């Protein structure tokens, strides 16, 4: 069936204007009667609670129980049949049918008021529960009140909103007309709640760190810049909370986490939005192996508690969170998925450059061997990491805040978690050698001064904090939006962010 959209600017402009004029006239009449925007209606139930409690009972039982309810919501459909009507009312719990008759409401109210209301109006009802001959749970209304007059019509709920631009820009319409979208965002909330509950049970403390920062740090990314008038200085929207969180570990907290927004002045894609939600945690007296185990247990718990299963569908994949996650080093993964690349090729810079050029990677002369390995991995290997997989042994060159590996200082004690072919999390044993950290930040600042906008600033305050002593610590960051995409079988990040970043309408 062909789907239509009543907000199509070409086909429906004239019709929309007519509806607006009609509804505005109705609103003006209501204003004259003093019957607009009532604010004293009290409900005692929402729709899904009624179905849970009374959905299995027959009509005779409901008559005996004489269940009186007060409920409010949006009128999304109605059938007027002479002196009786059926209305579908929608609230946060779902939908329920109303039965209205001139016998219960009086002829004058039914004809002069109710019949003139419109789809989209918000109503409050008092009435008795019963079941129709077809067995549908229904409220027989003895009073119905117009709470809010809707000036603009809602999209046809049967056809829904096809235009994704409208879904993203006017999310409220998407939520009204698309039950799946409404439930997706409820699931998102449940996922975040479950993360908090899991970490609370593990004795973590939730903290808050600055979003406006004098220097952005904690990740390699281009920041957003703003200006503080009173202080006469530039400030940056944070790209990561990491450096502040580690200062709290220095201050004596031993298990902390933060769930908040990060901002990166970068491109948009199916998996990237400039404003996104991140969970970061830090544990004193732990290493990256401990954090990998915690990550696995966290995701196992989330899938089980929120979705009711550890095996979930994502596109054509069945992702299994019940087993131990796969572990591979970056080099092992590259060689496994690129049979023409041998481990020895990745150990020699010239051979690694040849491998990179053969697969279309443009080599920057400033890159070292570690960066070249990482570029090869990102271009050829990430997309194959479908089941939950920890990739370890990242080069120190691309890990400026991570601890060097004791056995091979070329590598960092770091991992990234990949699921469905995309990075979901990043963790490592934290670098607490202040001299090593200072040297790496100096190197990052030098790269930044040469024109790389994504490299880090040198943060003297953080180095001073490190000099007071950071205990052995490990950390983890998980992108909440990408995690929600996986767990709701969504393939575009804009589908899981209520109000995604959009280009200005022309």
Curated annotation (Swiss-Prot):
CDD domains tied to this protein: LysRS_core, LysRS_N
GO MF, any single term: ATP binding
Keyword line: Aminoacyl-tRNA synthetase, ATP-binding, Cytoplasm, Ligase, Magnesium, Metal-binding, Nucleotide-binding, Protein biosynthesis
Cofactor binding comment, as recorded: Binds 3 Mg(2+) ions per subunit.
First-tier enzyme category under EC: ligase
Keyword Metal-binding among record annotations: yes
Residues annotated to bind Mg(2+) 1: 416, 423
Alphabetical list of Pfam families matching this protein: tRNA-synt_2, tRNA_anti-codon
Domain of life: Bacteria
Annotated EC: 6.1.1.6
Cofactor: Mg(2+)
Reaction equations catalysed: tRNA(Lys) + L-lysine + ATP = L-lysyl-tRNA(Lys) + AMP + diphosphate
PROSITE patterns: AA_TRNA_LIGASE_II
Biological process according to GO: lysyl-tRNA aminoacylation
Subcellular location: Cytoplasm
InterPro entries the UniProt entry points to: Aa-tRNA-synt_II, aa-tRNA-synth_II, aa-tRNA-synth_II/BPL/LPL, Lys-tRNA-ligase_II, Lys-tRNA-ligase_II_N, Lys-tRNA-synth_II_C, NA-bd_OB-fold, NA-bd_OB_tRNA
Oligomer status and interactors: Homodimer.
Family the UniProt entry places it in: Belongs to the class-II aminoacyl-tRNA synthetase family.
PANTHER family recorded: LYSINE--TRNA LIGASE, CHLOROPLASTIC_MITOCHONDRIAL (PTHR42918:SF15), LYSYL-TRNA SYNTHETASE (PTHR42918)
Record's protein name: Lysine--tRNA ligase
Organism annotation: Baumannia cicadellinicola subsp. Homalodisca coagulata
């Amino acid at each position: 069936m062909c789907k239509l959209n009543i907000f199509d600017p070409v086909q429906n402009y004239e019709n929309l204007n007519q509806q607006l004029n009609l509804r505005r006239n109705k609103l003006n009449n209501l204003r004259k009667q003093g019957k607009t925007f009532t604010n004293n209606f009290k409900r005692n139930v929402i729709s899904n609670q009624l179905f849970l409690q009374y959905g299995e009972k027959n009509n005779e039982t409901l008559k005996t129980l004489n269940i009186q309810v007060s409920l409010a919501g949006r009128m999304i459909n109605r059938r007027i049949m002479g002196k009786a009507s059926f209305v579908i009312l929608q609230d946060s719990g779902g939908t329920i049918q109303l039965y209205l008759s001139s016998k219960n409401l009086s002829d004058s109210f039914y004809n002069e008021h109710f019949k003139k209301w419109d789809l989209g109006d918000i109503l409050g009802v008092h009435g008795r529960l019963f079941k129709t001959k077809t067995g549908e749970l229904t409220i027989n209304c003895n009073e119905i009140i117009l709470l809010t007059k809707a000036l603009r019509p809602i999209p046809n709920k049967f056809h829904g909103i096809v235009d994704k631009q409208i879904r993203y820009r006017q999310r409220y319409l998407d939520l009204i007309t698309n039950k799946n979208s409404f439930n997706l965002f409820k699931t998102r909330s449940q996922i975040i709640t479950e993360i908090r509950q899991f970490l609370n049970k593990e004795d973590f403390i939730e903290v808050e760190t600055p979003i406006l920062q004098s220097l952005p740090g904690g990740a390699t990314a281009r920041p957003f810049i703003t200006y503080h008038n009173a202080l006469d200085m530039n400030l940056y929207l944070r790209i990561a909370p990491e450096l502040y969180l580690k200062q709290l570990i220095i201050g004596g907290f031993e298990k902390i986490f933060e769930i908040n927004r990060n901002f990166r002045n970068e491109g948009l894609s199916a998996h990237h939005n400039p404003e996104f939600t991140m969970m970061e945690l830090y544990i004193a007296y732990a290493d990256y192996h401990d954090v990998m185990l915690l990550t696995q247990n966290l995701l196992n718990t989330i899938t089980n508690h929120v979705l009711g299963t550890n095996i979930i569908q994502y596109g054509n994949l069945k992702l299994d969170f019940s087993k131990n996650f796969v572990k591979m080093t970056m080099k092992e993964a590259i060689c496994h998925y690129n049979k023409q690349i041998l481990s020895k090729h990745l150990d020699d810079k010239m051979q690694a450059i040849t491998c990179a050029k053969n697969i279309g990677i443009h080599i920057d002369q400033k890159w070292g061997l570690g960066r070249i390995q990482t570029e090869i991995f990102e271009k050829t290997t990430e997309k194959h990491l479908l089941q939950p997989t920890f990739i370890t042994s990242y080069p120190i060159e691309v890990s400026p805040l991570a601890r060097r590996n004791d056995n091979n200082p070329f590598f960092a004690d770091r991992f990234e978690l990949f699921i469905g072919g995309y990075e979901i999390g990043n963790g490592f044993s934290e670098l607490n050698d202040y001299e090593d950290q200072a040297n790496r930040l100096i190197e990052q600042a030098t790269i930044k001064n040469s024109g790389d906008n994504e490299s880090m600033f040198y943060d003297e305050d953080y180095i001073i904090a490190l000099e007071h002593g950071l205990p052995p610590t490990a950390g983890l960051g998980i992108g909440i939006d990408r995690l929600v995409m996986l767990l709701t079988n969504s393939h575009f990040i804009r589908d899981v962010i209520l109000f995604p970043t959009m280009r200005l309408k022309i």
